[in-house]
Amino acid sequence: MSSDQEMAVFGEAAPYLRKSEKERIEAQNKPFDAKTSVFVADPKESFVKATVQSREGGKVTAKTEAGATVTVKEDQVFPMNPPKFDKIEDMAMMTHLHEPAVLYNLKERYAAWMIYTYSGLFCVTVNPYKWLPVYNAEVVTAYRGKKRQEAPPHIFSISDNAYQFMLTDRENQSILITGESGAGKTVNTKRVIQYFATIAVTGEKKKEEPTSGKMQGTLEDQIISANPLLEAFGNAKTVRNDNSSRFGKFIRIHFGTTGKLASADIETYLLEKSRVTFQLKAERSYHIFYQIMSNKKPELIEMLLITTNPYDYAYVSQGEITVPSIDDQEELMATDSAIEILGFTSDERVSIYKLTGAVMHYGNLKFKQKQREEQAEPDGTEVADKAAYLQGLNSADLLKALCYPRVKVGNEFVTKGQTVEQVYNAVGALAKAVYDKMFLWMVARINQQLDTKQPRQYFIGVLDIAGFEIFDFNSLEQLCINFTNEKLQQFFNHHMFVLEQEEYKKEGIEWEFIDFGMDLAACIELIEKPMGIFSILEEECMFPKATDMSFKNKLYEQHLGKSNNFQKPKPAKGKAEAHFSLIHYAGTVDYNITGWLDKNKDPLNETVVGLYQKSSVKTLALLFSGPASGEAEGGPKKGGKKKGSSFQTVSALFRENLNKLMTNLRSTHPHFVRCIIPNETKTPGAMEHELVLHQLRCNGVLEGIRICRKGFPSRILYADFKQRYKVLNASAIPEGQFIDSKKASEKLLASIDVDHTQYKFGHTKVFFKAGLLGLLEEMRDEKLAQLITRTQARCRGFLARVEYQKMVERRESIFCIQYNVRAFMNVKHWPWMKLYFKIKPLLKSAETEKEMANMKEEFEKTKEELAKSEAKRKELEEKMVTLTQEKNDLQLQVQSEADALADAEERCDQLIKTKIQLEAKIKEVTERAEDEEEINAELTAKKRKLEDECSELKKDIDDLELTLAKVEKEKHATENKVKNLTEEMAGLDETIAKLTKEKKALQEAHQQTLDDLQAEEDKVNTLTKAKTKLEQQVDDLEGSLEQEKKLRMDLERAKRKLEGDLKLAQESTMDIENDKQQLDEKLKKKEFEMSNLQSKIEDEQALAMQLQKKIKELQARIEELEEEIEAERASRAKAEKQRSDLSRELEEISERLEEAGGATSAQIEMNKKREAEFQKMRRDLEEATLQHEATAAALRKKHADSVAELGEQIDNLQRVKQKLEKEKSEMKMEIDDLASNMETVSKAKGNLEKMCRALEDQLSELKTKEDEQQRLINDLTTQRARLQTESGEFSRQLDEKDALVSQLSRGKQAFTQQIEELKRQLEEEIKAKSALAHALQSARHDCDLLREQYEEEQEGKAELQRAMSKANSEVAQWRTKYETDAIQRTEELEEAKKKLAQRLQDAEEHVEAVNAKCASLEKTKQRLQNEVEDLMIDVERTNAACAALDKKQRNFDKILSEWKQKYEETHAELEASQKESRSLSTELFKIKNAYEESLDQLETLKRENKNLQQEISDLTEQIAEGGKRIHELEKVKKQVEQEKSEIQAALEEAEASLEHEEGKILRIQLELNQVKSEIDRKIAEKDEEIDQLKRNHIRIVESMQSTLDAEIRSRNDAIRLKKKMEGDLNEMEIQLNHANRMAAEALKNYRSTQAILKDTQIHLDDALRGQEDLKEQLAMVERRANLLQAEIEELRATLEQTERSRKIAEQELLDASERVQLLHTQNTSLINTKKKLETDITQIQGEMEDIIQEARNAEEKAKKAITDAAMMAEELKKEQDTSAHLERMKKNLEQTVKDLQHRLDEAEQLALKGGKKQIQKLEARVRELEGEVESEQKRNVEAVKGLRKHERRVKELTYQTEEDRKNILRLQDLVDKLQAKVKSYKRQAEEAEEQSNVNLSKFRKLQHELEEAEERADIAESQVNKLRVKSREVHTKIISEE
């Protein structure tokens, strides 16, 4: 809790945010008795404070604060929290959490004007109904960057937390501000926007300049200004709220990568258009109308031709016209200012006001009815003139279009008459359409202005939707608003209560699921499900003659009495009529459906729309420019009136927008703000208890607090936790060794002094209870403060010691000066001193003259030398400048590449983190989808029961509609038509004839009088529509019946396919995610282990080739063993088939015996023999299966172990190969790449096969050469190590000498400068002279020629041959020039060295400095030598690739041999130079000539290396420029090779898994072989890989689907035949069970295969991406090879480590495959266990048959018991085998499950109680059977054992004694096992049922929508066609008669 000083930053807002220290102290010292202080229930106040006086018999007597004594029940008493919890900021921290505690905490805070309170994870705000100073800039600044626990509750705190989460978690955020109407949502939305607009641009004002001339404000100003404009046109006064938002908006504020404001956009939902023309008494229209009439801007009054009195305009004066809390004049200025700031042009601004004024004038248009006619005509034109002027129209055209609209009939337009009522309705519709389209257009313009085109990274969305509304008159708008709030509340409940708890279970935290009872699915589905309210409304809109009453009747028929949330309202006095009531989460709302059909269809006068499109007001013309623009402006509902296919209702558009909104919200991290209405009277400070409690219950506030307290709301990934909180106790995590993040987090938390029950460890995250994370943050801040303080102290101490040392030195200097001054003062008057002063200058001058003479001579000499050296220096300086420039350019290039590499690595790390986050999101989304499916599952059962009923009712409804239409239009009794279609057609023919006669009569009347023309045409049109509708309905219903059936069958098949695919995809996704997490963890562990094993690499080199051969041998052996296993499996499958045949035959025999009723002893004997044979075969088969599986598992394990061991050894050898055999590995890689590439190209170019063979031959030759080079490299490496050691020693000695030289140089500064100049000149002479420049120019010239030749070789292969030959000749010429130049340079350098030797004799003290230069140059020489080696290898590889691709193998051989020879010569020279350098280095301090020889050798090598380096860099550059295509082919080739290896590994795993399962499912074996063949082809033909896999999978799915369809059909047939014959049912159930078992195993097999393939593909993609990254790094390393050899080594080490990691990952993949195989083995064992149980059941049957045979008196009863037991066992097997398909067969299997449970209960009771509580029908029979069975078993147990000879059954069923363990114990064990299996299968069935229900609901919803769309399209199309035909006939007849 902050102190008053800390709260001072909030300024005047501090008292409204947090209690003062004085109040907190008083609360802590307040007397309190926890036992007697309570809340008690009160009928008036809900709860009151009281003091307990006594407790007796469950009753409590208490005295309230008011002094009243009450007696209540114990459960109506709630303990009170201690006073320190009064006005607590987070109600989750309260000791006692219940409704009265929450209510009074809110009430007390509200009384103190603390309107914001935390409630667990969200914030509760109470509307104060007054202005509070808590939103000023001072408060914004105070909340910026504060953690939630550091500042009082506030909307700014929620906003800042969302902002910080967005920056840290890199995830989009959303703030959902919900509550009932009038709760303060709009105000809080504006505050959120104000906060973001303030903090996101602080300090960046200069950057937010307008991007165009139209913008009048900065981006933050525009975002803030959007609210006043939208409120003016979209907000209005309602009964509960003076500034109610009559539209919903979702404001997205986009931020850049740095968190700065980038742009914004607004999405609006469902503007309440009806308010434009109608308001209730206590309400008023939109604010803009009253702002304009406030006369604040008189020019608007004049421009719009209006008055300042709202009562002059009917549309805006139906309710109130003023609002006390709103100043319309000030609001008008704010609106006008917002229009300017938002960049609207002056024309657009004027158009907005004009269209608004025109809407007001529309309400004053008057029309009257013509005399003796129903035709309407204008009653005056003054108002119409004003409206037309404002809209840029002609008033006469406008009135004519309103009164006489033109309707298109066929291809012609017909003028139609309108009644007065129709005209008024059309005017109102036009006014609403203009206002609505203008509003949407303004929103689009605002979005256009707010889109700054700046880069966006993330956004924060703020949702402000109209709150829940309960008015006296609730229409369609209220239903849409309340439905939206219902969906948002469901989203809140799901996020807070379901996802939160599922996250705990997913992470493995012990948690019991808590059902808070907050599921709102019933009400939501009642509104939006098929045949829901919206669906019925849209269906009614499709029928021309549908009315509000028909809509109400359909609602009642569908839902009244069937849905608890749909009720018939009770009539109330003084209230508007209500037609139905809905029970929402916030209360029951009565809805009036008057006019809903028209509102939903939203018709417009097309003639007036045509005028609008031609308006001179551009904005109006733009609004109605056509359907395309309508959709663009967000209003597609007006655009499609010409074709039925484009017809879209308001409700459909609303649902579409709502679904988009919910999708957006689910993709963000939500933050909830719950707004509360304190009272209905808008009184500040007053709180109505019951009203607040109702909102708290509905909003889930208490449940949210409860789950926050019980659960773990805070969580963080292990890696993030370790990184952030390691500072708390760094010693807990050991340094220098790898430790898993989870273990590190556990150790860290264990070492911290916190309550260990307050956190839990999940699989990927650590979870904290509420408040603990804040405590850790405080501890971290304290620790950081301590560390910083300690660091500052040490820094200050260091600075103080330095200052003290300076002071000591100054003091000593002062003492020295003082001593000398005192001494001088003592001797200055001494006579000898005076003489000394006089003589000393004379002596010094004589010496000076001598010295000057000598110095002049020396100066002359030096001057001459200087002149010579100066000339040389200038020449060398010029060269130095050029070289320095080149060096700087290279350094800049290297630096840029290094920065790019760093950026790439950073991006890679970010992508990895993002990938982890996205995977977590995918899991959450998947779980969320599963939750949604579970929510919908309950209703699916009801829907399934009603499906048949609905289809029948729908047919009846269609027939009734046809009948009603005929009764209304034809006035004939058509009851016979419903019974028979033939009679209906006859009636229609008669009706058509009569209508034709009436039409002729009407046409004759039309010729007689023009006055009756319009009325008669209306009748003709009406009758024609009726006739065509009837004809169309009859024809279409007859024709579409068969199409509908076919369509439903097709959709049913598609549904089944989609359900199977969905389930497989979900399962595979979960498996892949789990496997990925395990593999990632193991990958980290393996990387750490590999780092420790690298030291053993050098000892394992000789074993590489032998191990590879061994691997191949083992693989060949494994393939042989796998073939043997396949043969064994085939035999096993045959045996299994024989077993199933015998089993089926045995069952048939048993059934025949049962049907016969009295089997003979011979038949029983035969049955026993067959069963014994069957049992023996089964036992043999099981033993063989176990043996084969054990053998296969052992072989696989042995193979995996050997492969792992060999792979580990290979990995160990890899580093040595790459480090010590650079040339060998690169050339081998190049040749392998060429060979692989030629294999690929050989399919298209057969002529390259010869080159492949040539390359293979050359490979063997190169390997021998490489072996020799390997030995040479080893020797050179050893020499280099010794030289490096000696160089280090020399460097140390040189450092010491440098220090000595620096001291001597102070005394001889002039001479040292000359020496330094000479040394620099000497170094420059050694580096380069005129010969070097000549050689460089010739080399560049040669390189230019080579570049031109290389470009020409792209034009043709012949030109490439000539270019390569010429380049080789020029290279040879250059080499000869180089050799001659080198000889000349050597002679010149020898002369220079002699001169240097003489100088060195005179200046021997400077030898050490020169020696330092020698050592550094030696290092440079070695570095450049390595670079030369690498670059030479690169050139050789590139030349080899070019030669291979262009069929120039011979030239390649020549070039390769030349480079090889040169390479060997260079190595020989290097070896000689190194030996000579080593010998010279040892004698450096004794022999002076050693320096000359070393320098000579050094310069020779430098010259050669530099020339070679220049040549190679130029060649590399031109080859890189000209060979882009070659490199691309190489990359493709390497990718293919990598994919080949990866896919090969995956293929082996997949084959192992498939072969393991092939023995069980023979029908799937062919499909898996097809998968294998497809994968093999994919390796050879990469381009067809994906298509082949898809086709293969599709074939598998189709085959499996067809199999499943066949089994389902057979299953359904079996169920239908069950009613006819029980014997046939048993046989078909056995077949069905067998088929289902095979299909289920096939599905499991396919899922496992698909999961392995997907996992393999993921690893393949990861490896490819990693390889691409490494290739890019390698390319950069090659470019930086000249100056950054150390970086090359580092990157190569990185490459090696990555390669090892990839191989480790492959090994882990193999391990995972092995685990999968082990799991399959376990599965097999479980299947064997199941078979054993089935065997036991069969044995029980045989035993009971034996008992029946021996018990003659009870033979018939025992036989019946055996029949019952067999039926029970068969149904148990049926339930077990068909559980995977229950989602499609639940309805048919419900009875079967019940029978199974019933019989299982009977068996359990029989075993436990001896038949005491049997069902009435079987009681007597089973009792007798039980007694006989027990008596017979006691006498014959030994005989039964001998006959059956089943030792395994004897051991399992514990038949070891004769009397103690009899039939009861055996049956008990069997029943327990069966019951456990039944329960497990029930759980599986429920899960499958839920999935099935979800899929069925989705399918049926789609099916229903499709049916509706097709029906609407067919109806509209047939109506249009027939109307066209009829109109043509009428037109032709009229013309002919005229």
Swiss-Prot record:
Q: Which UniProt keywords apply?
A: Actin-binding, ATP-binding, Calmodulin-binding, Coiled coil, Cytoplasm, Hearing, Methylation, Motor protein, Muscle protein, Myosin, Nucleotide-binding, Phosphoprotein, Thick filament
Q: GO cellular component annotations, sorted alphabetically?
A: cytoplasm; myofibril; myosin filament; myosin II complex
Question: Where is the IQ domain positioned along the sequence?
Answer: 784-813
Q: Which family does it belong to?
A: Belongs to the TRAFAC class myosin-kinesin ATPase superfamily. Myosin family.
The Basic and acidic residues compositionally biased stretches are 1127-1146
Q: Which parts of this chain are annotated as the region Disordered? A: 1124-1146, 1152-1171
Tell me, in a sentence or two, what this protein's role is: Required for normal hearing. It plays a role in cochlear amplification of auditory stimuli, likely through the positive regulation of prestin (SLC26A5) activity and outer hair cell (OHC) electromotility.
Which residues are recorded as modified (Phosphoserine)?
A: 625, 1091, 1095, 1161, 1236, 1242, 1260, 1287, 1291, 1302, 1305, 1473, 1494, 1513, 1541, 1553, 1573, 1599, 1602, 1713, 1725
Comment field on protein domains: The rodlike tail sequence is highly repetitive, showing cycles of a 28-residue repeat pattern composed of 4 heptapeptides, characteristic for alpha-helical coiled coils.
Positions bearing Phosphotyrosine? Y389, Y424, Y1463, Y1491
Protein name as it appears in the record: Myosin-1
InterPro entries per the record? IQ_motif_EF-hand-BS, Kinesin_motor_dom_sf, Myosin_head_motor_dom-like, Myosin_N, Myosin_S1_N, Myosin_tail, P-loop_NTPase, XRCC4-like_C
What processes does the entry annotate via GO biological process terms? muscle contraction
* Quaternary context: Muscle myosin is a hexameric protein that consists of 2 heavy chain subunits (MHC), 2 alkali light chain subunits (MLC) and 2 regulatory light chain subunits (MLC-2). Interacts with SLC26A5.
* Species of origin: Bos taurus
* Phosphothreonine modified-residue sites: T64, T69, T419, T1240, T1264, T1285, T1466, T1500, T1516, T1729, T1735
Recall the GO molecular function terms of this protein's record. Answer: actin filament binding; ATP binding; calmodulin binding; microfilament motor activity
Q: Which residues form the Myosin motor domain?
A: 86-781
Q: Where is the Myosin N-terminal SH3-like domain?
A: 33-82
Q: Where does ATP bind?
A: G179, E180, S181, G182, A183, G184, K185, T186
Task: List modified residues, type N6,N6,N6-trimethyllysine.
Answer: K130
Could you tell me where this protein is found in the cell? Cytoplasm, Myofibril
| Coiled-coil ranges per UniProt | 842-1938
